[in-house]
């Protein structure tokens, strides 16, 4: 009885199974488009940063890689928004996230913002000495600003924090893109779905030989 009710419930809910995929796309699209736009707007600086070994990533073929990263994020973000070729565009975006994780963020641990109370920094799960030292540095910075700066104005847009720049965002985006890679843009809510539906309808109308 319960098993049948459970099956019937989720059978009815399956008509809306495209909504989570739509929400993933709507979440990711502006992030990717903005990242691609920023790269395109300062492309020469991005190329320098990709190739420079002193202050950048020291990657080979920086012009090619910068172009590919920019195109993947800018074009891929637009395609995600539309639900067009969702599985295909997820691939270069996942590669871009992996490159960012392993060339920029991995040495900083997991957290994007230094939070010494996090289990991902205090040794409960992971240990990050830099994050654990952040509260003392933040306290010193606040003290200086309270003494010599307009502290109320400086914090009127939000509290001061220490940026850790770990892999948190990159890994999260990668997982979201991985879901889209396996499940596509979503039923009823993507161009992919309607294009495939039209193709199936067309094939179904062809005479059998």
Identify the role of each PLM range.
Residues 47-61:
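Perimembrane loop-to-helix junctions flanking transmembrane segments
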Residues 1-45, 60-71, 75, 82-209:
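Extended, low-polarity transmembrane helix blocks
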């Amino acid at each position: 009885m319960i098993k049948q009710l459970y099956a019937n419930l989720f059978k009815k809910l399956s008509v809306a199974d495209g909504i989570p995929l739509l929400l993933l796309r709507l979440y990711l699209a502006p992030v990717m488009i903005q990242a691609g736009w920023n790269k395109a707007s300062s492309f020469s600086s991005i190329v320098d940063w990709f190739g420079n070994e002193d202050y950048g990533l020291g990657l080979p073929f920086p012009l090619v890689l910068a172009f590919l990263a920019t195109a993947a994020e800018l074009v891929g973000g637009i395609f995600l928004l539309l639900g067009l070729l969702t599985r295909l565009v997820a691939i270069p975006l996942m590669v871009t996230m992996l490159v960012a994780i392993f060339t920029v963020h991995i040495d900083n641990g997991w957290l994007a913002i230094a939070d010494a109370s996090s289990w991902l920094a205090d040794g409960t799960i992971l240990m990050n000495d830099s994050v654990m030292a952040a509260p003392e540095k933040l306290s010193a910075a606040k003290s200086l600003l309270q003494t010599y700066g307009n502290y109320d104005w400086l914090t009127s847009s939000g509290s001061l924090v220490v940026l850790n720049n770990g892999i948190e965002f990159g890994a999260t985006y990668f997982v979201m893109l991985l879901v889209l890679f396996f499940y596509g843009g979503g039923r009823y809510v993507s161009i992919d779905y309607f294009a495939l539906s039209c193709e199936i309808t067309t094939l179904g109308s062809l005479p059998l030989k």
